[in-house]
Amino acid sequence: MRLIGEMIARGRQAIVLIPEIALTYQTLLRFYQRFGDRVSVMNSTLSPGEKYDQCERAKAGEIDVIIGPRSALFTPFPSLGLIVMDEEQENSYKSESTPKYHARETALEVAKLYGASVVLGSATPSLEAYYRAGRGEYRLLQLTKRLTGGELPTVYTVDLRQELQEGNRSIFSRKLQELMTDRLNKGQQTILFLN
C-alpha cells in the first residue's frame, strides 16, 4: 500500500493483480479505505459496458488503482507506475484459453512499456520467480518478522534423494518424522498439507 501511495503522489497509477475474483471484495475494501473512490475493479463479472466505462475512466486519469485478475493488466492507464502481483505463484495467473499467456511475464512486459515497477508478492514464491531472484534478475525482499510480532517458523530443507540413498524409503524424511514424534509426545497435534 505504501508503494502504491508513493506512485499516486507522483501522479502515476497502479494495477493490483489478485489470483481469484472471490478475493476482489475484501481487497477492494482495504484499498478503498485508503485511497477512496479512485480505486476500481476490472474482472469478468462486469458487463461489456461496465468494462468500457472503467477503461475510459482509466484513460482519463480518474482511477489511480485498478484491482482484478490477470485481465486487469490490459487496463489502459496513461501513466502506469506499478504492478503488484499478489500470490504470484498461483496457477490462475496462467491463461489456458487463446491467447495463452502468463500474467507474470505479461506484467513484466507491460511494465517495460510504461517504465513501471513490478512487485511479485508471495509467501511461497514460484520456482521460476525464486530462481530469477537467486540469479539477480529480481530483487528478493524477505519478511524477517510478522506484522503481528509473532515469530516466523523454522524451515527445514531436506533432500529426499539423500534420504533414499541412506535407506529411508518412507515418504516422510527423518527430520519430519522426528518433529512429528516430538509434537505427539508433547500431546500436540500435527497437520500435514499435501500439495
What are these regions (language model features)?
Residues 1-5, 107:
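Motif I (Walker A/P-loop) of helicase-class P-loop NTPases
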Residues 7-33, 50:
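Conserved Walker A/P-loop ATP-binding site and its immediately adjacent core
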Residues 11-12, 61, 115, 187:
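Glycine-centered short loops/turns at secondary-structure junctions
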Residues 12-20, 42, 189-195:
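Conserved RecA-like ASCE P-loop NTPase motor core of nucleic-acid helicases/translocases
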Residues 29-66, 77-80:
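Conserved motor-coupling elements within RecA-like helicase/translocase cores
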Residues 39-48, 90-101, 162-170:
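Flexible beta-alpha connector loops of hexameric P-loop NTPases
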Residues 57-119:
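SF2 helicase catalytic motif II
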Residues 105-195:
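Conserved interdomain linker/interface between the two RecA-like ATPase lobes of SF2 helicase motors
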